[in-house]
Regions:
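Extended low-complexity, polyampholyte segments enriched in Ser/Thr/Pro and acidic residues
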Residues: 67-197
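Alpha-helical solenoid scaffolds that mediate protein-protein interactions
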Residues: 3-7, 11-12, 55, 61-65, ...
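Elongated alpha-helical scaffolds
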Residues: 22-43, 57
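Long amphipathic alpha-helical coiled-coil segments
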Residues: 48-63, 173
Length: 197
């Protein structure tokens, strides 16, 4: 993955002066590198908290690239900032347990719409693949659909990562706190032996 990033940088595949429509069709797939880095690193269980934090950083990288091309809708940008607890300046805000719960309890209508949208994208991708896998690199509709379905996956993954980080933080806090919940029973005083006269 890092080799691909070096190639992207050296060949200047992406530019701040471009719009999304200016990106070559065969280069759209390179926009997904940071996304797949996040997906891959999430599979590691050692140093789990660090792994999850890196996963969020890769999603940030993916989001920032999309933003630089103004690819995302205002609603998507707003949703991302809400999920990552960031204000308009991009600074991390303190979150409450209620916010974490709300992430997992999305509006039912939104979930249904997201499911339908994801299903339509998946069907479109499969249809294009069936028609001719050898011409996929030239098919702009395919790569845009592929990009969009992975944006949805990112939105689905972030709340899960946040919840897992919260759980790890809670466990760490419990371990560090002194065990003062249960007061120790005072030892009974020993009776002094009376000295014989």
């Amino acid at each position: 993955m890092n080799d691909i990033k070096v190639k992207i940088y050296k060949e200047k595949i992406f530019s701040d002066n471009e719009e999304f429509k200016d990106i070559k069709t065969e280069d759209i797939k390179f926009m997904l590198v940071a996304f797949y880095q996040s997906e891959l690193i999430q599979k590691f269980m050692v140093n789990r908290k660090n792994v999850l934090e890196f996963a969020l950083k890769f999603y940030d990288e993916f989001f920032n690239l999309l933003q630089s091309y103004e690819y995302l809708s205002k609603e998507q940008v707003k949703k991302y900032k809400k999920l990552t607890h960031k204000d308009e300046e991009g600074e991390k805000q303190k979150k409450t347990p209620q916010q974490s719960f709300e992430e997992m309890s999305q509006n039912r209508t939104e979930k249904i719409e997201m499911y339908k949208y994801k299903k339509n994208l998946s069907e479109k991708i499969k249809k294009i693949e069936k028609e001719g896998i050898d011409k996929i690199d030239e098919n702009r509709e395919y790569w845009i659909s592929y990009l969009n379905i992975n944006i949805v996956k990112m939105f689905e993954s972030i709340p899960m990562i946040n919840m897992e980080i919260d759980a790890i933080n809670h466990m760490e806090k419990m371990k560090k706190e002194p065990q003062q919940q249960m007061p120790k029973n005072p030892e009974p005083k020993k009776k002094k032996k009376k000295s014989k006269a």
